[in-house]
Structure formats: structure tokens, C-alpha cells
């Protein structure tokens, strides 16, 4: 992951803001990169407490454990019982597992500027840019795997 969707006014996400210089190296060195933008793309892979409870409770010991830990964390953080949360890290693994989970395209590698905006240089190498998460398909697969 890294940065936000290109339509956002900045690329200032949790990971990129930690070290813009590192993001510039990773995106500028020419290695194969898959960008899963946070806000505007991966943020769409959001689930609510109610959905998690409905689809996962009682399906397996692992799913019950994950729910208990996640619920305790979110209630401590959000200070309320009703919440929704993007499952950021699931999408990175999903991209590796099956192309049906998301849609991507080749784009020139963005330049992470120090003002937290993307720079554009059409001479740069291409990266894979994920622009859409197939939320329902990915959740269906995740729930089936966690129920085993």
C-alpha cells in the first residue's frame, strides 16, 4: 500500500507520511511495484461490526478469536459499539491470490513529493495501480476461508 487514490488531494497516508524519502526510493527505483492506494480504493474494503458478527461469529474457533480481539480493539479506540473499518492488509494478500478480487492497470510510477502531493513524470517506469476492489467477491472468499 502507499499513498491515496490519485483523485485525492494528497498522497499523505499513514505509511507514506512515515518516510516520504523511502516512498520516493521504492516508487522511483524501477522495481516492480503494485500500488494499493488507501483512501479512494482500499478504503472501500470496509466492514461494520454488525457484518462481521453476522458472517463470522460461530463459524470457527479462529473466526471467533479474531472477532473478539478486533471488537475489543475497536471499542477501545472508537469508544462506541457501532463502527466500520477498512481491512487494509487483506487487500495486499488478495491481490496476490486472485485477480478477480480487484481491478488494476499499468500507470507511470508517481513521484511522492515532499508537500504530500503526487508529482507526474511520464518518463518514469510503469507500476500496477489498483483502482477498484471487488468488495463483495473478496469478502465472500474471506468468510469462506475463515469458516474452515
What is each model feature region?
Residues 14-21, 25, 33-148:
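Conformational coupling and interaction surfaces
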Residues 1-11:
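Class I SAM-dependent methyltransferase SAM-binding "motif I" and its flanking Rossmann-like core
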Residues 28:
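Histidine/acidic residue-rich metal-binding segments in metalloenzymes
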Amino acid at each position: 500500500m502507499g499513498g491515496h487514490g490519485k483523485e485525492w488531494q494528497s498522497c499523505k497516508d499513514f505509511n507514506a507520511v512515515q518516510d516520504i524519502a523511502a516512498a520516493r526510493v521504492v516508487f522511483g527505483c524501477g522495481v516492480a511495484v503494485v500500488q494499493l492506494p488507501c483512501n479512494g480504493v482500499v478504503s472501500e474494503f470496509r466492514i461494520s461490526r454488525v457484518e462481521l458478527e453476522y458472517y463470522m461469529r460461530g463459524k470457527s474457533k479462529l473466526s471467533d478469536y479474531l472477532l473478539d480481539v478486533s471488537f475489543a480493539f475497536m471499542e477501545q479506540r472508537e469508544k462506541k459499539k457501532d463502527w466500520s473499518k477498512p481491512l487494509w492488509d487483506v487487500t495486499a494478500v488478495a491481490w496476490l491470490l486472485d485477480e478477480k478480487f480487484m481491478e488494476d492497470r499499468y500507470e507511470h510510477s508517481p513521484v511522492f513529493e515532499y508537500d504530500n502531493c503526487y508529482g507526474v513524470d511520464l518518463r518514469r517506469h510503469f507500476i500496477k495501480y489498483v483502482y477498484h476492489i471487488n468488495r463483495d467477491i473478496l469478502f465472500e472468499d474471506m468468510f469462506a476461508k475463515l469458516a474452515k
